[in-house]
């Protein structure tokens, strides 16, 4: 039996176009993620007893660092697609073709969450050292927003017809136009909607984090600083490891695309590292009964 009514099909990357200007779904979803994250993190920070202005002051630095990190990370592992004849591209502005390095065309897609996490974390360390804020308290109020923002942002992959999985005929199958399919699957029409899997998984992660935060805020549960951050690393990375195994466009360390034959899937490797880091953090907090070292403090101790 065909379940055509459940078929997913992207309407395209552009929400609307006005003359030379266009609004892309990808950019809109990122903007929505930022706004939702700002409001949620500000509310959680206030309940945590942090300064009300903290999130507003941190957000511009965090967003800029995260976007830059996400793009650099992606381009670094896909460098072959941005060299030689592919190095230059152009944008049309008022009927003028302006040359631009293709690596800067972030609006066309091609960002990686792990790059955003790395640069975003570094920016928080810098900010907390500068403002003398407690690093783990700050990052604990941010991770629920990160999970929710990822759930929203993943839909940008849907509109761009990217980051999809291997062929499938499941009821929730995703139709991919011919020009976006890997050559090996050129005759296949339907694929796993891995963007949807990750979006749903991130909502699940968000639910766990916000539930525990509220329990802690009501004094019904004791959560030492860093607990939510470690839990985020573990839960998000578990889902990402599985979902990455379905994708046809993984970033590879060596190997042959689209399945990194003879090489490694970078996201799975990073996920294993993050799971290990999260478990070590939980062990230190709850078994060794020691506070996590504060990376924003010069001596590594909590401020």
UniProtKB/Swiss-Prot annotation:
GO terms for biological process: lipoprotein biosynthetic process. The chain crosses the membrane at residues 18-38, 58-78, 106-126, 133-153, 193-213, 223-243, 266-286. Its EC number is 2.5.1.145. A 1,2-diacyl-sn-glycero-3-phospho-(1'-sn-glycerol) binds at residue 154. Its main location: membrane. It is found in: Cell inner membrane. Keywords: Cell inner membrane, Cell membrane, Membrane, Transferase, Transmembrane, Transmembrane helix. Pathway: Protein modification; lipoprotein biosynthesis (diacylglyceryl transfer). It is a multi-pass membrane protein. Pfam families: LGT (PF01790). GO terms for molecular function: phosphatidylglycerol-prolipoprotein diacylglyceryl transferase activity. The keyword Cell division does not apply. GO terms for cellular component: plasma membrane. The keyword Zinc does not apply. NCBIfam families: lgt (TIGR00544). Catalyzes the transfer of the diacylglyceryl group from phosphatidylglycerol to the sulfhydryl group of the N-terminal cysteine of a prolipoprotein, the first step in the formation of mature lipoproteins. Belongs to the Lgt family. This is Phosphatidylglycerol--prolipoprotein diacylglyceryl transferase. It comes from Prochlorococcus marinus (strain NATL1A).
